[in-house]
Amino acid sequence: LKILMVSSEAVPYAKTGGLADMVSSLSINLAKLGHEVKIVIPRYYSVDRSGLKLLPDAMGTPMGGGIEEWSAVYTADMPGATKKNPVKVYFIDHEIFFGRDGIYGNALETDFIDNPRRFTFFCKAVFQLCRKINWFPDVLHAHDWPAAVAPVYLKFAERTAGSAGEFKDTVSVMTIHNLGYQGVYHKDNYDYAGLGWDVFYKAGFEDWSMMNMLKAGLYSCDKLNTVSPNYAEETKIQVHGFRLDGVLRYRSADYSGILNGIDYNVWNPEKDKYIPQLYSSKNMEGKAKAKEALQKEFGLPANSKIPIIGMVTRLTDQKGVGELFGPAYGSAWSICRDMDLQLVLLGTGDTWCEIEIMGLTSRLSNFKAKIGYSEKLSHLIEAGSDFFLMPSRYEPCGLNQMYSLVYGTLPIVRSTGGLVDTVENFNEKTGSGTGFMFDYLSPSSIYDTVGWAVWAWYNRREYIEKMRKRAMAVNFSWELSAKKYIKLYEETLKKQGIKLKVNVQ
């Protein structure tokens, strides 16, 4: 199959979150399965042009109001892909739209005021790029709201009777990475799309007199999915649907969840370059060394008998930090005061939470935190901790709980989203499970579940060791996820009555 990934981010070029990792990893693994994959992203100011190849001639993209936007196009080979199965990355270089600090906003402007124009142009330019390189995909795979207008252009412009017909056999798949971000702007921005106001309503842009880019993509794509099966079900109910639950119920027959994978070349205790000693489920000596190094790094007393609970997180409401660190009601103080454990945290985010956390570290001898992010330290926390705490309010997929399982670190999580699909709750009677789960997000439920894990550490140690080995045996490879995406692509082509050109390997 010919597959075109349309995204605002892809590592190592542009990243604000897990979207960037997913797009690159999925593309590389689809290519390994024998498919022809290309990625298109904007060339932001932060992307160094010196490592890119400039394609000849500027590219014109006609927009609404008689405007024609001109851009340069650069290309590069995706690092990590093989020479036998390369992945080409194309960069749309529009100096006014993308030649600035930040992807969606900067320190002065949380959300750039021209974001609807920036990413509407990007979505239209994708089709001009295909014409420029004379390559037309079987599948256009759009990711999150910045790419959501691409399926709209495909359905209402490029596949219509009046079009040139190059995309008549192209289908679209739309992936939701986080339903909380939808690209909602004033509808005055819509004229720039050049699609006509009848399409505004037909495509589903209309959202209480605003323009909702993600909603339009979800209405217009041929099939849609999200990044875990359980999150797909959750988003169809009002409490988790961010006002789009009705759309997702309407598209229910075409909506599914596919769990993200993880990169075992990076997150693997048998290969990890950031930990003091490699280890595996057959020889756990390296985990003990990592625990010792972690205690030293955070200035905690070296003690192999006391459990360490680790956290690597964004300090935002989505991650449950209010219930854990809220100054009047958070449970972190009580947990550290009442339980014989050590708690370490690496994170950055809301200012109030950073201040509260640093205050707690000065008052509690068994709680230590570092504000910021460090790749090396995040690996050490995953390897050296005994438990990993994720009290998320909602979690589309979640990666840290999967990293934890691979490292034999048992997750303590709320049963939401992808956490339900990846963690099996502990059974006191049989010792089965790979982690500890709670249903309702509250300070008391976090306290009780951490207490449950600490109780098991001191009173059911043989179960803890069995859970570790069971956790380390779980397979979260991207190859498995890639095969599920191929099945989704084939189902989409079949739905549209387009004959398959390549079989799944």
Give each language-model segment a name.
Residues L1-Q505:
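Catalytic cores of nucleotide-sugar-dependent glycosyltransferases that transfer UDP/GDP/TDP-activated
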